[in-house]
A protein has these predicted regions:
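Extracellular/periplasmic periplasmic-binding protein-like sensory domains
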Residues: 285-358, 369, 374, 419, ...
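Segments of small-molecule ligand-sensing domains
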Residues: 344-354, 365-421, 425
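Short, polar/charged alpha-helical segment
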Residues: 82-106, 231-238
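Extracytoplasmic "Venus flytrap"
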Residues: 70-91, 119-125, 148-151, 219-228, ...
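Ser/Thr-rich, Proline-interspersed low-complexity disordered segments
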Residues: 13, 23-63
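Beta-alpha junction/loop-to-helix N-cap segments that form part of ligand/metal-binding clefts
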Residues: 81-88, 103-179, 188, 250-257, ...
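Extracytoplasmic ligand/sensor domains, especially the bilobed periplasmic-binding protein
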Residues: 126, 141-247, 296-321, 328-329
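C-terminal motif of bacterial Sec signal peptides marking the signal peptidase cleavage site
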Residues: 17-21
């Protein structure tokens, strides 16, 4: 019975299931289809203009208050008489440039005054070296100005080279300084090679053949410059028709020259060439007068370059000639103004070394302006390229730093130093021959 009932229930359940599956399917709830959004092109908005940033003009470095330059000069000691002529030349030139506002330097776009520091080296090369080192370390100088005397410059030029500071110097004729390969040394002043031949050329140009003092005595100082110049006089003599009949050597500071004088007199010397200091030169000529030897022509470089020569020797010092590097009678621009300033202070026209010293500052200022900077190397290059007229006339430089400058011959006449060569610059005629001392 239970089995039948179970079968009936299963059948009923199955029928019910089939009936449900055969009925209509229910309507599904519609699901909205996603419609892609309409693509609207973006509106192009122009960017906000940004004004360009102005490039600032390069700022110039601040200009120094002054252009520092420095000099070591023998104002005392054996070269003191020379240094006394050099110092005013430097100072007057600096004053003149500063009165015009200074030196224009393009790097700073303005004129800057020169500031000159001067030390007295007491004619001592060791002290001169020390002074230049001080100028370099403390004043930080843009350029050096030299002192006076060949052995002084020989010492100081080496310091300029070591420190790579441009150096302008005069009052020295020693050529060998320029043969050391120095790049910072410049000298607008005649050197031994010129003096060693110019004397013969000038004599031959002014004295007729047959009247020339062809027998020459040389009194050579035992110094580097003495050896150099004496050797050139000796070497060049035969080329111009002259003979060296006596060649004497002496140490600086010698007191007795009588032996040398008597030998020259006995050899029949008609001309005397020498390069003594002021004390040696005056002693030499006083003894020549005492011994009665008056050469027809005397070229005595250095000693007679100071007015004290005339004061000390009077007529004994007359007729002597010099190669001083300049004379205040030269007709170049600026000479008259220099003489006027010197006259106001010293009651005479400018001394022989004052003009060349003045020219050094003119050359330096011109070079700084052309360089457009205070860079020492660029100033050095500008000095090397110098081509200008100064109070000593036209100036250019050779590769070794020697200057191409006038080499004037000056002669003592009537208590004054007169310019006798070149002829277009002369202030007096050449006086020749020199009479005996007792006939003056």
């Amino acid at each position: 019975m239970r089995a039948k009932l179970t079968i009936v229930l299963v059948v009923a359940l199955l029928v019910s299931t089939l009936a449900t599956g055969c009925g209509p399917a229910p309507t599904p709830t519609p699901v909205p289809t996603a419609v892609p959004p309409t693509q609207v092109p973006p509106t192009k908005v122009p960017p906000t203009p940004v004004p360009p940033t102005a490039t600032p003009a390069p700022t110039k470095p601040p200009a120094p208050a002054a252009i520092e330059i420095g000099a070591s000069i023998p104002l005392t000691g054996k070269f003191g008489s020379l240094g006394a002529q050099v110092k005013p030349g430097y100072m007057y030139a600096v004053d003149a440039i500063n009165a015009a506002g200074g030196v224009y330097v393009k790097e700073f776009d303005k004129k800057i005054p020169l500031k000159l520091t001067i030390y007295d080296d007491e004619s001592d090369p060791t002290k001169a070296v020390s002074k230049l080192e001080t100028l370099y370390a403390e004043q930080k100088v843009t350029a050096y100005l030299g002192g006076a005397g060949s052995d002084m410059h020989a010492a100081t030029a080496a310091i300029a080279e070591k420190n790579k500071v441009p150096y302008l110097g005069i009052a020295f004729a020693l050529y060998q300084i320029h043969q050391k390969g120095y790049k910072y040394l410049f000298s607008p002043f005649p050197k031994s090679p010129a003096q060693g031949k110019d004397v013969y050329e000038y004599l031959n140009a002014q004295i007729p053949e047959g009247q020339r003092p062809t027998k020459v005595a040389i009194f050579q100082e035992k110094t580097d410059w003495g050896i150099e110049l004496g050797g050139l006089w000796k070497e060049n003599a035969p080329k111009y028709g002259y003979t060296i009949v006596d060649y004497e050597e002496y140490a600086p500071g010698t007191k007795d020259y009588s032996g040398m004088i008597l030998k020259a007199k006995a050899a029949g010397a008609e001309a005397l060439f020498g390069m003594p200091t002021m004390p040696d030169g005056t002693a030499m000529f006083k003894q020549m007068a005492e011994l009665g030897w008056a050469p027809k022509f005397s070229l005595i470089i250095r000693a007679p370059e100071n007015v004290a020569w005339g004061d000390s020797l009077g007529k004994v010092g007359e007729y002597v000639t010099i190669f001083p590097g300049w004379h205040n009678g030269e007709k170049f621009p600026g000479v008259a103004e220099l003489n006027a300033k010197y006259q106001a202070e010293f009651k005479r026209p400018a001394d022989l070394l004052t003009g060349p010293a003045y020219a050094c500052v003119q050359i330096l200022a011109n070079a700084i302006e052309r360089a457009g900077t205070l860079d020492r190397d660029k100033i050095r290059d500008a000095i090397a390229a110098t081509n200008m007229t100064t109070v000593v006339g036209p100036v250019t430089f050779n590769a070794d730093g020697t200057g191409n400058v006038l080499d004037p011959l000056v002669q003592w006449q009537d208590g004054k130093m007169e310019l006798v060569w070149p002829l277009d610059q002369k202030t007096a005629d050449f006086a020749y021959p020199a009479p005996p001392f007792n006939e003056r």
